[in-house]
A protein has these predicted regions:
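Structured adenosyl-cofactor binding patch, chiefly the S-adenosyl-L-methionine
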Residues: 95, 133-137, 151-153, 158-164, ...
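Active-site/ligand-binding-proximal alpha/beta "capping" segment
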Residues: 190-242
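Short beta->alpha connector loops at strand-helix junctions that form conserved
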Residues: 52, 76-77, 119, 145-146, ...
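Glycine/charged-rich beta-loop-alpha catalytic/anionic-binding loops adjacent to active sites
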Residues: 18-21, 108-116, 229-238
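RNA substrate-binding interface of SAM-dependent RNA methyltransferases
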Residues: 35, 101-102, 107-197
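Short, hinge-like loop/turn segments at secondary-structure boundaries
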Residues: 67-68, 92-93, 159-163, 207-210
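N-terminal positively charged helical leader segments and presequences
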Residues: 1-88
Length: 265
């Protein structure tokens, strides 16, 4: 089989998916590396799997499994693999996938007991890490509220380490509509706030029922008007001298606190 070069039209089209405009236009995105590709294959969203000869020696069962499942598997040159990959050392394994996000109503229809709701999250690495944490704690969904980063951004996909394909993810631009819909579903809305009236260490009763956690933007935190709409504002106790925690760390602490209470009921 001849390897496709970086000039092949299929390779060129796939490389264009590194751009947000092309992802929006096609409804497709790239998943890079064995973890993400394996998770994508499990969901049946892969349209084509590009692999280099180098990757074929390392990930042969994964590639063979994809082919057996009817996925188009395509050998590409090492140069083409470098173009397809977004990391310095390209893994040589890149899948073209259909978008993963679902409507907010679909997430709420599953009667979730734990949701992560990052508001206006801007940094794709943080978004991917938060999605990975949500997956690890067994959350039922992630709702990217407001003007949020595209979860199909390559950096977000890589940071999620496959979790993007495990957890339902919704995007909804109108924050007020998100809060209304979550409340209407009978879910308690908690906002993280440095001066929250509830200490996380004393919040077990609140955490026992269905909960949606609001997390603020990396640079500006949670808009006070949004925090005011939550049922409660919760502070993470800081015993040392750090002024605050970054978004992913705060999310991990709060989501794990919820999971601990819900799993020990």
């Amino acid at each position: 089989v001849d390897a496709l070069s970086e000039h092949n039209p299929r390779v060129v089209s796939a490389v264009k998916l590194q751009r947000a405009a092309q992802r929006r236009k096609t409804g497709q995105f790239l998943a890079e590396g064995a973890n993400s590709v394996a998770a994508a294959l499990e969901t049946g969203r892969v349209r084509e799997l590009f692999y280099s000869m180098h990757a074929a020696t390392r990930e042969n069962p994964l590639i063979a499994g994809a082919a057996a499942a009817g996925v188009r598997t395509t050998l590409v040159s090492e140069r083409a693999a470098e173009h397809l990959g977004e990391t310095v050392t390209a893994p040589g394994l890149v899948a073209v996938c259909d978008h993963i996000d679902v409507p907010l109503a679909d997430v709420l229809a599953e009667r979730p007991t734990l949701l992560a709701v990052p508001v206006e999250i801007a940094e794709p690495g943080n978004a991917g890490t938060l999605i990975r944490v949500a997956d690890a704690v067994g959350a039922n969904g992630v709702v990217l509220a407001g003007d949020a980063v595209d979860p199909h951004n390559g950096k977000c996909v890589r940071a999620s380490a496959g979790s993007l394909f495990h957890v339902p993810i919704a995007r909804h631009r109108d924050i007020g509509e998100v809060l209304d819909a979550v409340a209407a579903a009978g879910i308690t809305v908690l906002a993280t706030a440095a001066k929250g009236e509830v200490d996380l260490d004393e919040a077990d009763e609140l955490l026992a029922g269905p909960v949606a956690w609001l997390f603020g933007n990396e640079a500006h935190g949670l808009d006070p008007a949004v925090a005011a709409r939550a049922d409660h504002r919760v502070r993470i106790p800081i015993h040392g001298r750090a002024e605050s925690l970054n978004l992913a760390a705060a999310a991990a602490i709060c989501l794990y606190a919820s999971a601990r209470v819900q799993h020990t009921k």
